[in-house]
């Protein structure tokens, strides 16, 4: 369905050109949500920045634009407020008619895009032979959320897991395991991932301190790269062991990924060097092959190179990322490539993108985006660690969230005198615990660090997953109490929006499409979280102040329709965040 906001934006742009000529063609009408409900639903701030350009007072500009504006049947006549804001209010009759259409639409009025794009979302990307830790949490959750939203809007999304499954560390680990635990290289499940991580640390210490061991490990890398059967088999076993552990976490988080690790691109690395050489970008510096970057200098002020092949012939991360980028453009035919990693890699990706751009690999149609995020911090404001100072294992973090959610639920059941089955308790604990962790992350602006707090994220009060899930549960409670299937109301409600709480809820229900469009533009999932939080607040105000089951017909059916739309919107919105809902909790 056409968004009333899109229509208004188009009409405003036409009015600005009609009032002041083609100089304002393409000018942004600066439409935003009204600062307060008393000012209406939206306001245009455009007259204020135009005052200097047009040499007129903002209120005069606002009045002139309004004189040329045809808002259409959806809107009340616009008003001018303050220094020159233009305020717009949707007609109550229009609100009701639009919501009635959404009652029978499984997509809640949100159209799929007319021109779907092929989108690659690169996220999660743990390292083989290492456990997933809290540092992988944000990439995994943010990347999955963006992929879900893009898929829902009709784009063709390839979710890629660029795992670290190649490099010197495997020569080091295989060499060490041959000495201390050879069965790990010949039999599956001979050691668990925790043991493998410990062996990896020991191998690294040996590699750093023992030149003879280091030389053997480097020879092992050569054997692996040349495809020696025993080395290749050992590597495959290590990868399979890690993969099984990763899958446990992905299943718990309900994450779907296509694994395409660094090893996939290994055969393509010589082609990257050759292609860069053919473009004239490649420079040899102290035996290494590199590309000197524009806009980057070292401390001495000299141009900074991006090394793509070391003097010993080895490759680095940048080479692999260039090969991956080229493959995604040429073979995957991607229109849009999104990399979801921590902010510390921003410079790396800016440099990789620059080299690919200068090499002529990126057609104009391609949109390349790095989606950076901040750190997960402990209550002390420092990087989240265990009490012993180790990195927090992601499995431990998720297990504790579920355990705490279970304890909270059991305490509440005891206080209420309720009896529930162990299966019910386990299911609710998992949905609430996992949902709380996801929502606590996604509700923050991803560019900021955030403090990880189980107490805050599991609270039934405030901007949390339990609060939103409980709002959904309240609607299901209406259904049970009234013995009504809200999904199958006996007659199509004619919505009657009389009370202010009904109107505020109705207006908010119509905004989801605009919110998803904004998230698609700036890739900030917290916008969707804020929308759902405000929806829950508005529903709770409506629920507390407007009788539903006790109301007389046709008002009763109208309010049941509003409750049904709220539940469906919450369920859809939470599913786009990767969070399940509950019928009871």
Swiss-Prot record:
InterPro entries: aa-tRNA-synth_I_CS (IPR001412), Arg-tRNA-ligase (IPR001278), Arg-tRNA-synth_N (IPR005148), Arg-tRNA-synth_N_sf (IPR036695), ArgRS_core (IPR035684), DALR_anticod-bd (IPR008909), Rossmann-like_a/b/a_fold (IPR014729), tRNAsynth_Ia_anticodon-bd (IPR009080). Keywords: Aminoacyl-tRNA synthetase, ATP-binding, Cytoplasm, Ligase, Nucleotide-binding, Protein biosynthesis. One of its GO terms (molecular function) is ATP binding. It is found in: Cytoplasm. It catalyses: tRNA(Arg) + L-arginine + ATP = L-arginyl-tRNA(Arg) + AMP + diphosphate. GO terms for cellular component: cytoplasm. It comes from the Bacteria. It holds the Pfam family tRNA-synt_1d. A motif ('HIGH' region) lies at residues 126-136. GO terms for biological process: arginyl-tRNA aminoacylation. Its main location: cytoplasm. Its EC number is 6.1.1.19. It is an enzyme of class 6 (ligase). Monomer. PANTHER family: ARGININE--TRNA LIGASE, CYTOPLASMIC, ARGINYL-TRNA SYNTHETASE. Belongs to the class-I aminoacyl-tRNA synthetase family. This is Arginine--tRNA ligase. It comes from Cyanothece sp. (strain PCC 7425 / ATCC 29141).
């Amino acid at each position: 369905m056409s968004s009333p906001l899109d229509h208004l934006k188009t009409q405003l742009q036409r009015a600005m050109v009609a009032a002041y000529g083609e100089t304002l063609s393409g000018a942004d009408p600066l439409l935003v949500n009204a600062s307060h409900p008393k000012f209406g639903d939206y306001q245009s701030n455009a007259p204020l920045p135009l005052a200097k350009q047009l040499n007129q007072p903002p209120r005069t500009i606002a009045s002139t634009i309004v004189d040329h504006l045809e808002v259409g049947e959806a809107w009340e006549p616009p008003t001018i407020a303050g220094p020159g804001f233009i305020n717009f209010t949707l007609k109550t009759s229009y609100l009701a008619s639009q919501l009635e259409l959404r009652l029978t639409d499984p997509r809640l009025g949100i159209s799929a895009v007319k021109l779907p794009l092929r989108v690659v979302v690169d996220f999660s990307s743990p390292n083989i032979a290492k456990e997933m830790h809290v540092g992988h949490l944000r990439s995994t959750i943010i990347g999955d959320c963006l992929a879900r939203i893009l898929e829902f809007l009709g784009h063709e999304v390839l979710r890629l897991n660029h795992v670290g499954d190649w490099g010197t560390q495997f020569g080091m680990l295989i060499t060490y395991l041959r000495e201390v635990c050879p069965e790990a290289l010949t039999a599956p499940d001979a050691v668990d991932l925790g043991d493998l991580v410990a062996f990896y640390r020991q191998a690294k210490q040996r590699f750093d301190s023992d030149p003879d061991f280091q030389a053997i490990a480097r020879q092992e890398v050569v054997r692996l790269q040349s495809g020696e059967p025993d080395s290749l088999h050992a590597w495959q076993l290590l990868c399979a062991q890690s993969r099984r552990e990763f899958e446990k976490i992905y299943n718990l988080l309900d994450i779907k990924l296509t694994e395409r690790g660094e090893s996939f691109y290994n055969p393509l690395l010589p082609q990257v060097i050759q292609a860069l050489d053919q473009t004239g970008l490649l420079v040899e510096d102290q035996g290494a092959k590199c590309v000197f970057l524009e806009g980057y200098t070292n401390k001495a002020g000299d141009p900074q190179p991006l090394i793509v092949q070391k003097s010993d012939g080895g490759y680095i991360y940048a080479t692999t990322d260039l090969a991956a980028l080229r493959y995604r453009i040429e073979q995957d035919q991607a229109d849009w490539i999104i990399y979801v990693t921590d902010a510390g890699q921003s410079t790396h990706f800016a440099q990789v993108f620059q080299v690919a751009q200068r090499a002529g690999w990126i057609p104009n149609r391609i949109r390349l985006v790095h989606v950076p995020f901040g750190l997960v911090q402990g209550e002390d404001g420092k990087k989240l660690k265990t009490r012993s100072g180790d990195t927090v294992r992601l499995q431990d973090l998720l297990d504790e969230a579920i355990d705490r959610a279970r304890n909270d639920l059991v305490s509440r059941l005891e206080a209420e005198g309720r009896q529930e089955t162990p299966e019910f308790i386990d299911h609710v604990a998992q949905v609430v615990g996992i949902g709380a962790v996801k929502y606590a992350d996604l509700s923050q602006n991803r560019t900021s660090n955030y403090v990880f707090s189980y107490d805050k994220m599991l609270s039934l009060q405030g901007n949390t997953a339990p609060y939103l899930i409980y709002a959904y549960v309240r609607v299901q409670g209406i259904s049970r109490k009234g013995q009504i299937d809200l999904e199958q109301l006996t007659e199509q409600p004619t919505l009657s929006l009389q009370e202010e709480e009904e109107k505020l809820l109705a207006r908010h229900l119509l905004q989801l499409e605009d919110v998803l469009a904004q998230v698609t533009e700036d890739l900030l999932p917290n916008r969707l979280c804020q929308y759902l939080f405000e929806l829950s607040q508005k529903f709770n105000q409506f629920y507390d102040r407007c009788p539903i089951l006790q109301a007389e017909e046709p008002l009763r059916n109208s309010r049941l329709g509003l409750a049904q739309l709220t539940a469906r919107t919450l369920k859809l919105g939470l599913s786009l965040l990767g969070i399940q809902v509950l019928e009871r909790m």
